[in-house]
């Protein structure tokens, strides 16, 4: 018998020329089976049975050796981008331990500033210059490397990629400050090392350009943005306070100048008076200029009491503005924490919605699970290796019933070897160790054998693994072991294997093939189960996301509590109003409401129309109509009884037809009025008299 190629994990299509599907990590690969064994290009199928894109990689390792170089380059590119992004975050957006580096840089800058200050003192000038020169070397190296790394790491942002993007990043204000400080430091070091006294004295002032290094500590400009936002938010109040304070300063300086210009030489000009007014109204008070006359003192005291209050207003406005802005930022951070739970909740809700079996047109979620589910390729190779080792190096198709020597038959129990075309060989003792791939493989190959051989095998009886090695001809004195928990779990109805391998010698090879393994686990059983498991996982994730989102909705402060209470109060008022409208629609409005509506803009016709719409108004209308009908029936019955008592047709015309009360029939109008009834009665009496005369 020729050795057939090993079969892969089939999804159980019909035999013949039908398409064949192969399962790889719960992702089917379907190919057309040709006449010579099939060599067409495979098509991957997802959990929904729809073909996946042809360029999508197969899950699991070993998907192809041709793309190994591309995968290595892609992995290297990913590592490069990850490193670039990490460095950019450390330098531009420090968090956690990254602050250690920035604190070290701050200490270097602060030390350089202190040494620059000490270098201007005559007693410490020589020592400070030597230490400052060494520190400047260190600062040049550190800041030069940092500047280059900053420009390189900016490529992780899309707008800073390429040479143009790097140049755009270098034009940022803080990068320009870094470049200016770096150039100034290099110039100072170069002049100091050459010993040029003139150049050193000229460039000594450039050291104070290094004060700009303190500005670079706030790379993101958060403090300047906060100050600008506070000034912009309270710009009207600040402009008003500054305007009134400026007017007070001008008038106070001018009046004091007029009062003191003749008696006091300190106020010889209006500029001297403005200097005195600025120092006095800002509560600094150097004391270099003071008014000497009583008129000047009185004016200075009055304008000081009035002007100081306006000059102090901007400080209070800015202080309260900063406090409100900081509180608002804290609230904003608290609200920003809700974004991720809200996004997770929306994503979980959509995935739960899309995994419903009634919505087969939503396939994106299933493609996602096709890509993350594990592969069975390593498991299949392991099973094949174990089978070869157990079969003595033979392939599964070459395994037959092994001959047992006569002497060994009495010492050892008979070993059952099974054969199944196109599949691996498993003995009953090994059935408990079969994986899902082998079970599906046995099911698919059992379907390919055709219905001619399947109907010959009787339905198998499941046996416990503990008693599988005991043959049918064994001694009856041996008691069979009871089912354990693992055996019951192993032989459930959904995952139960039904072997039909007999320990006795089979009559022929064909009978052994007919008694091959049967497996109830097919792809049709696996896929719905997998989808159900995925949907259950989506339900759990949705509930967890919902709980986390509710936890973030807790109030932040008293203002949030008041807002929640006010929103709840408005909601309650709306519900009460809706309930009152429904009650009015059912019961109707009371007499007090009617009087109120009659006094309003609505006319009586609108009021009656509203009352008739209500359920109670309709019930009252029906009752009035029933009463009117009853009254009319009573009148008709009385009229009919009087006609019967008269006895003759001649006296029918003399009977007076009773008239209906219009008040009773106000809500119900009969199609025949009382005048028509009297006329019809007279016509009836005339016709009867004519008929009697003719007789």
UniProtKB/Swiss-Prot annotation:
Residues 1-21, 441-483, 588-608 are annotated as: Disordered. Residues 342-351, 535-549 are annotated as: Interaction with CALM. Residues 271-292 dip into the membrane without crossing it. Residues 546-650 are annotated as: C-terminal assembly domain (tetramerization). A 1,2-diacyl-sn-glycero-3-phospho-(1D-myo-inositol-4,5-bisphosphate) 1 binds at residues 93, 172, 219-220, 225. Residues 591-605 have a biased composition (Basic and acidic residues). Residues 119-129, 192-202, 259-270, 293 are extracellular. A 1,2-diacyl-sn-glycero-3-phospho-(1D-myo-inositol-4,5-bisphosphate) 2 binds at residues 220, 235, 330, 333. Its main location: membrane. It is a multi-pass membrane protein. Expressed in both the inner (IHCs) and the outer hair cells (OHCs) of the cochlea. Reciprocal longitudinal gradients of expression is present in IHCs and OHCs. The strongest expression in IHCs is in the base of the cochlea and in the apex for OHCs. A basal to apical gradient of expression is also present in both type I and type II spiral ganglion cells. GO terms for cellular component: basal plasma membrane; monoatomic ion channel complex. It is found in: Basal cell membrane. Belongs to the potassium channel family. KQT (TC 1.A.1.15) subfamily. Kv7.4/KCNQ4 sub-subfamily. Pore-forming subunit of the voltage-gated potassium (Kv) channel involved in the regulation of sensory cells excitability in the cochlea. KCNQ4/Kv7.4 channel is composed of 4 pore-forming subunits assembled as tetramers. Promotes the outflow of potassium ions in the repolarization phase of action potential which plays a role in regulating membrane potential of excitable cells. The channel conducts a slowly activating and deactivating current. Current often shows some inward rectification at positive potentials. Each channel subunit contains six transmembrane segments (S1-S6) with S1-S4 forming one voltage sensing domain (VSD) and S5-S6 contributing to form one quarter of an interlocking pore-forming domain (PD). The CALM binding domains correspond to the first two membrane-proximal helical regions that interact with a single calmodulin/CALM molecule forming a clamp-like structure. CALM N-terminus binds to the second helix in both calcium-free and calcium-bound forms and regulates channel trafficking. CALM C-terminus binds to the first helice in calcium-free form; this interaction is disrupted by calcium binding which regulates channel electrophysiological activity. This is Potassium voltage-gated channel subfamily KQT member 4. The lineage of its organism: Eukaryota, Metazoa, Chordata, Craniata, Vertebrata.
């Amino acid at each position: 018998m020729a050795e057939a190629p090993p079969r892969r994990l089939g999804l159980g299509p019909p035999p013949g020329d039908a398409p064949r599907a192969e399962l790889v990590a719960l992702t089917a690969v379907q190919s057309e089976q040709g006449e010579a064994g099939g060599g067409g290009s495979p098509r991957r199928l997802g959990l929904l049975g729809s073909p996946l894109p042809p360029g999508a990689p197969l899950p699991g390792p070993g998907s192809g050796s041709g793309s190994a170089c591309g995968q290595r380059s892609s992995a290297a590119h990913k590592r490069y981008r990850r490193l670039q992004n990490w460095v950019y975050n450390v330098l531009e957006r420090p968090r956690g331990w990254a602050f250690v580096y920035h604190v070290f840089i701050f200490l270097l800058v602060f030390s350089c500033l202190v040494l620059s200050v000490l270098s201007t003192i005559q007693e410490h000038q020589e020592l400070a210059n030597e230490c400052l020169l060494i520190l400047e070397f260190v600062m040049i190296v550190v800041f030069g490397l940092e500047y280059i790394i900053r420009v390189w790491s900016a490529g992780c942002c899309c707008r800073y990629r390429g040479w143009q993007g790097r140049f755009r990043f270098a034009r940022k204000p803080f990068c320009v400050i870094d470049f200016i400080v770096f150039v100034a430091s290099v110039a100072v070091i170069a002049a100091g090392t050459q010993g040029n006294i003139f150049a050193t004295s000229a460039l000594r002032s450039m050291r104070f350009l290094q004060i700009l290094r303190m500005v670079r500590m706030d790379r993101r400009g958060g403090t300047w943005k906060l100050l600008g936002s506070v000034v912009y938010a309270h710009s009207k109040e600040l402009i008003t306070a500054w305007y009134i304070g400026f007017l007070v300063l001008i008038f106070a300086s001018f009046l004091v100048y007029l009062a003191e210009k003749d008696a006091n030489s300190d106020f010889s000009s209006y500029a001297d008076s403005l200097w005195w007014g600025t120092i006095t109204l800002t509560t600094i008070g150097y004391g270099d200029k003071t008014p000497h006359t009583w008129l000047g003192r009185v004016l200075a005291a009055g304008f000081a009491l009035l002007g100081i209050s306006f000059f102090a207003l901007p400080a209070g406005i800015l202080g309260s503005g900063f406090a409100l802005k900081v509180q608002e930022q804290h609230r904003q951070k608290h609200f920003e924490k809700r974004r991720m739970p809200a996004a997770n909740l929306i994503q979980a809700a959509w995935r739960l919605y899309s995994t419903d079996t009634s919505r087969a047109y939503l396939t994106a979620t299933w493609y996602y699970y096709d890509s993350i589910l594990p592969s069975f390729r390593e498991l299949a190779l392991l099973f094949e290796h174990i089978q070869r080792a157990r079969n003595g190096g033979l392939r599964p198709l070459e395994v037959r019933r092994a001959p047992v020597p006569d002497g060994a038959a009495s010492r050892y129990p008979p070993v059952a070897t099974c054969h199944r075309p196109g599949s691996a060989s498993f003995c009953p003792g090994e059935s408990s160790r079969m994986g899902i791939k082998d079970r599906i493989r046995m099911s698919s190959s059992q379907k390919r054998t055709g219905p001619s051989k399947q109907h010959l095998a009787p339905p198998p009886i499941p046996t416990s693994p503990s008693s599988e090695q005991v043959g049918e001809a064994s001694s009856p004195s041996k008691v069979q072991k009871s089912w354990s928990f693992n055996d019951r779990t192993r032989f459930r109805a959904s995952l139960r294997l039904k072997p039909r391998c007999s320990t006795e010698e089979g009559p022929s090879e064909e009978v052994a093939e007919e008694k091959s393994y049967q497996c109830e686990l097919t792809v049709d059983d696996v896929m719905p189960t997998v989808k159900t498991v995925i949907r259950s996982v989506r339900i759990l994730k949705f509930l967890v996301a919902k709980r986390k989102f509710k936890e973030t909705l807790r109030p932040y402060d008293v203002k949030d509590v008041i807002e929640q209470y006010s929103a709840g109060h408005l909601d309650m008022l709306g519900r009460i109003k809706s309930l009152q409208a429904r009650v009015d629609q059912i019961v109707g409005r009371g007499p007090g409401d009617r009087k109120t509506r009659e006094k309003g803009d609505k006319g009586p016709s609108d009021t009656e129309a509203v009352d008739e719409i209500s359920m109670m108004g309709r019930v009252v209308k029906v009752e009035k109509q029933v009463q009117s009908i009853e009254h009319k029936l009573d009148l008709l019955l009385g009229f009919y009884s009087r006609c019967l008592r008269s006895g003759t047709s001649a006296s029918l015309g003399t009977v007076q037809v009773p008239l209906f009360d219009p008040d009773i029939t106000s809500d119900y109008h009969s199609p025949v009025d009382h005048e028509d009834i009297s006329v019809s009665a007279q016509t009836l009496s005339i016709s009867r008299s004519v008929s009697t005369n003719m007789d």
